[in-house]
Amino acid sequence: MNANPKFLSADAHVDEAAVAPLPNSRKVYVTGSRADIRVPMREISQADTPDSFGGEKNPPVYVYDTSGPYSDPEAKIDIRAGLPALRQAWIEERGDTEALTGLSSDFSRERAADTATADLRFKGLHRTPRRAIAGKNVSQMHYARKGIITPEMEYIAIRENQRRAEYLESLKTSGPNGEKLAAMMGRQHPGQAFGASAFGPNGLTAITPEFVREEVARGRAIIPNNINHPESEPMIIGRNFLVKVNANIGNSAVTSSIGEEVDKMTWAIRWGGDTVMDLSTGKHIHETREWIIRNSPVPIGTVPIYQALEKVNGKAEDLTWEIFRDTLIEQAEQGVDYFTIHAGVRLQYVPLTAKRMTGIVSRGGSIMAKWCLAHHKESFLYEHFEDICEIMKAYDVAFSLGDGLRPGSIYDANDEAQLGELKTLGELTQIAWKHDVQTMIEGPGHVPMQLIKENMDLQLEWCDEAPFYTLGPLTTDIAPGYDHITSGIGAAMIGWFGTAMLCYVTPKEHLGLPNKDDVKTGIITYKLAAHAADLAKGHPGAQVRDNALSKARFEFRWEDQFNLGLDPDKAREFHDETLPKDSAKVAHFCSMCGPHFCSMKITQDVREFAAQQGVTDDEALKKGMEVKSIEFMKKGAEIYQRQ
């Protein structure tokens, strides 16, 4: 892989499409208890309700925003300099970390001295890595268990609430019908949360910093914020919070450049990616990762065994603990926020996969299975797990305990190998928690719908409610090219049952490396699944956006319908294919039914008739039916009549 010349040139910049604000949206910041807690949100402005519908004011709707400074017109974006170090002051003021005099990893030092890669390096970083002072633990879980509410926790509480209280208050003061309007727009169906404590009749009406602290201390949620990634905006992953979505990017040995991967990252977060995993396996993994981290406002995850394998020329049996340890330190000092580590692939489970239709499909799982068989012993990941914990808590890197034995077909779902590994991951979680290391659990995979809840229930039981992070699951194997849909079905279900973060699947799954369009399709599909899960659980305020869009639809506010949706561009494009003129944006019909058969237009006609006659809507319908009956009989009572 060669570097993209434009990306490395003096005027390198991200794709203009990734930094333009979304239609009728602007970046706003909500300040917390201190001036440097400025939480970003996207404000979507709305048009007033037309006079024919009552002439109401429709205040802006606020939504969760993962795009970082890229969608802020006032921010100066220079990818060669990276993003501002948002959390640097918070990290330093705690007094439990130190700036290192140099790089701790042997590989990092070798790479820094390698003249062949000099032109590829990120040169905008002018600080050295930080690490916990000897004997200190700098994880957010450690602070939470000591009763400390960190700035990150307050930031998250503000972010999760999405200014819902302010929105409802603005409705109340919008006019004479404000109280009624607020009650209508704030209405939400009761959810079924399957035991998640934040929801239900006695649940929360808003997320508080103390609640964030409690959930992190309990291990039910994680805040993936490496101290060497101060550019990241704090976010939380847990079943009592909004369901999150991860996007996978990364180069391979045969395609893609550093520049393309940075573009994919900014594109993914524009459309709602809450975290991004860099799964690069080609050349220049180290340099690609540095560029991505320095320009990412969301947590970055990796699978360190991929790079470790590159260091031994792809021979799994040549991997050692020493090489892997050095790779962990290298990536921790770059700022990786969570590591996928397949420590649950034990020697005793490998033979169980022989009965499978598709064997071991996890890349990391197959690497470790091969190592176990070659050496006929437990993997160094399992044997050195406590040593890994020592590294994690020195930088606040979170575990994403990998499901190396996940099923690669619905035939293999919920088999002995998969569930055996899951039980081991639960045991490893307890060890990680003993060190106050934040931990989430990765899950399948390919699972038919009737077996999905069993996966969730066993994970909650065996892993003691540690956050579950699942790939889909795909609910059928018959749709290559459409696996974003086969998996989106499973993602919505398992998100409802309790999964905290969904790993997106693109249309290219099983077929090739996704491009930017595939990334967007995957993100939108999974934001939809995550939101459906939030609605089903009864997350406080989850229905606000649905209510706002439904009201806009009923009032034929077309632009507001587009802009309140997950993909305004696509909605506008589809509408304009058949009704491209500006006049169609205020029409009281669309191309589906036309002007005479629009159900919402008919409903409005009934309401107007009721108002004119001084009767209720039901009475108006009855009167209207009587009039139409007389007309029908006068015309000969024929179903089909000449015009």
UniProtKB/Swiss-Prot annotation:
RNA-binding keyword on record:
no
For this chain's record, the cofactor binding note is: Binds 1 [4Fe-4S] cluster per subunit. The cluster is coordinated with 3 cysteines and an exchangeable S-adenosyl-L-methionine.
UniProt keywords (A-Z) are: 4Fe-4S, Iron, Iron-sulfur, Lyase, Metal-binding, S-adenosyl-L-methionine, Thiamine biosynthesis, Zinc
- Binding locations of [4Fe-4S] cluster: 590, 593, 598
**EC numbers, comma separated:** 4.1.99.17
Molecular function GO terms recorded: 4 iron, 4 sulfur cluster binding; carbon-carbon lyase activity; zinc ion binding
What is the top-level taxon of the source organism? Answer: Bacteria
Chain sites annotated for binding Zn(2+)? 446, 510
Task: Tell me a GO cellular component.
Answer: cytosol
Give the required cofactors.
Answer: [4Fe-4S] cluster
Q: In which pathway does it act?
A: Cofactor biosynthesis; thiamine diphosphate biosynthesis
* One Pfam family per UniProt: ThiC_Rad_SAM
**Which EC class is this protein assigned?**
lyase
Reported function:
Catalyzes the synthesis of the hydroxymethylpyrimidine phosphate (HMP-P) moiety of thiamine from aminoimidazole ribotide (AIR) in a radical S-adenosyl-L-methionine (SAM)-dependent reaction.
- Protein family per UniProt: Belongs to the ThiC family.
What is its quaternary makeup?
Homodimer.
Name this polypeptide is given = Phosphomethylpyrimidine synthase
Q: What's the source species for this entry?
A: Paraburkholderia phytofirmans (strain DSM 17436 / LMG 22146 / PsJN) (Burkholderia phytofirmans)
